[in-house]
Amino acid sequence: MALAHNLGFPRIGRDRELKKAQEAFWKGELDEAGLRKVGRDLRAAHWQAQKDAGIELLPVGDFAWYDQVLTHSLTFGVIPERFRGHDGAKPTLQTLFAMARGVATGRSANCCGGAHAQEMTKWFDTNYHYLVPEFTVDQQFALSWEQLFEEVDEAKALGHAAKPVVIGPLTYLWLGKAKGGDFDKLELLDRLLPVYDEILNRLAGQGVEWVQIDEPILVLDLPQEWKNAYERVYNILQRAPLKKLVATYFGGLEENLGLAANLPVDGLHIDLVRAPEQYPTILDRLPAYKILSLGLVNGRNVWACDLEKAVDVLRHAAERLGDRLWVAPSCSLLHSPVDLGREDQLDTELKSWLAFAVQKCQEVAVLAKAVNQPDAAEVAAALARSRAIQAGRASSPRIHKPAVQARVHAIKPGDSQRQSAFGQRIAKQRAGLNLPAYPTTTIGSFPQTPAIRLARQAFKQGKLTEADYVEAMHSEIRHAVQIQENLGLDVLVHGEAERNDMVEYFAEQLDGYVFTRFGWVQSYGSRCVKPAVIYGDLSRPEAMTVAWIRYAQGLTRKVMKGMLTGPVTMLMWSFPREDVSRETQARQLALAIRDEVLDLEAADIKIVQIDEAAFREGLPLRRSAWPAYLEWATEAFRLCASGVRDETQIHTHMCYSEFNDVIESIAAMDADVITIETSRSDMELLEAFEKFDYPNEIGPGVYDIHSPRVPSREEMVKLLRKAALRIPAERLWVNPDCGLKTRAWPETEAALVNMVAAARELRATA
């Protein structure tokens, strides 16, 4: 008999109830009892939804008030000194939210005064962010937070078969950072393990039969000493009197396969969506007593599973494993929207191609039933439906566009190369643009005021005519251009008032994208995103930005930048297709953006910026796979940027803080100017560009837009002088480190006044 289980369920709620409750609590509009009730109701609803879908063993402990790693930090007592209560008091929900969000100076809280939040970073290669644990050399661990045990009691009281979910000790340590000294995090292991042992024994005392221990770092390139630690850790943890399932996901085990298969635990979960090739080897290597959980339903995307293909694997596995076979999604469904049933405006055909978390649980249950009751009418009907969906998608003219495919096949190497080398281009650009030394510009967006958002909303709802909406946006553009001229900026932007989001704005205008109404997923805390879905071949029916930029250019004699989002970022921040490669989708996007770049050039726009905020995010988890990704990602950028004349200057913007290991690929993009985020690192990031001898022009961000603080002219002069020690002055631009969309106008203007003054001071002393 195959058993249907789940690794984790989205916590936000069908209508983002958790987000709304969190934000009401932070504003003081909801008390703690009210917040806790929302959490309790959501957990009960989610467990019931999974049970109704046919899941037999339910994940418990996957709920978090902000982030699951942060929950573990509280559980283990890993609470930085700045958040600790008086006299060793137990942490509270206020402590948890303070660690996540920081505490403003002067605000009284029962745990801390002014304290900056913990660092946040990407959860492996997903678009979810976790709060990075902070470890000190003398770090002590102690069970300090009862949430897991309370939730197990809740689930059992509701009559559910509960499988608690905990992050494994080695993955938890790997995810954290050593603070205040150079020490090896592995040295903390012996202090941490007794807490795990205590947790497992308490769960056993609650009547728990199985616990899921997540060890996703087993799909990474691990140092030998971390590999060596695994067997020792699980030899210690096996003493606890309950069964343990080690869960791996987001990739294949590769050289860690033997290690994972032979850990002294009762079961192993593997991801067969990301790494189907590991299936035969794991089947041969798994000890005869051990459960094998096969992740066959994609937990990270929105497409309906090809049930027939999955059933073939399962029936083969059942012959070998018998009752030792479990079925699950590939990973936690945290990364999937909640319930496709909420979507009331998708057309029937397209909706039939999709599956959200509830539907993925139903798919898992049907797969288990296909093994256990192969002749059941329900199984036959589900397989027939799945076959029809797969056949329909394979031949649908909505998906497959011969003209787009022909254009991709016709791409020649020369299409992704500029006409001349940078040295020749820049000479022509300088002559044509006639900019001063240390030219000043901004990254693209200006403050999105309530008036802008209201106008956009009214237009979408049909309450504002198109003519009135265009005039409202023109008014905002006039305002932005006037302010920039008054400030004395050299290269202007139109301010992006008409754009809701840097991906959504373009996706709405491209064929091959569709939008859901309720396809929300958690990014972090209360922040939810609703990625667009790429369902078919991508193309641009008509110009997307030209009218706005042309209008802005008509208001000034200064140079106006065109502003676009690059192909890699468009892809990374969407739910991609599964029937063609990411490389193919990136090329289709690149061709669509290339058309827009050429239209901007034809409209006499002399500078076009193509943002690639997510370029680094696309890097695979294993370094061996980096070269292939970097090759197609840089080629996609060059393809969208290389159709223009030498005289047209291409800019790109990247907002992250690690360039050393991808600097060659950034150079290979061959943008004439790259603007980057460097202010918080005090220009140290430029070391990578200096060492590599980066040949093109650079705009290192001279102030941090994420802070409302207005930096002084002197600070920016100092940063620019530092930059000029690493990068020749004639190749330096002066700009903030990111777009100004989230800031208010007064602080924006004040900061830009000082930035322009700093550039002028440097020109005067050059």
Curated annotation (Swiss-Prot):
5-methyltetrahydropteroyltri-L-glutamate binds at residues 16-19, 122, 527-528, 573, 617. L-methionine binds at residues 443-445, 496, 611. The keyword Transferase applies. Zn(2+) binds at residues 653, 655, 677, 738. It catalyses: 5-methyltetrahydropteroyltri-L-glutamate + L-homocysteine = tetrahydropteroyltri-L-glutamate + L-methionine. GO terms for biological process: methionine biosynthetic process; methylation. Keywords: Amino-acid biosynthesis, Metal-binding, Methionine biosynthesis, Methyltransferase, Repeat, Transferase, Zinc. SUPFAM superfamilies: UROD/MetE-like. The active site is at residue 706. Pathway: Amino-acid biosynthesis; L-methionine biosynthesis via de novo pathway; L-methionine from L-homocysteine (MetE route): step 1/1. Belongs to the vitamin-B12 independent methionine synthase family. Catalyzes the transfer of a methyl group from 5-methyltetrahydrofolate to homocysteine resulting in methionine formation. This is 5-methyltetrahydropteroyltriglutamate--homocysteine methyltransferase. It comes from Pseudomonas putida (strain W619).
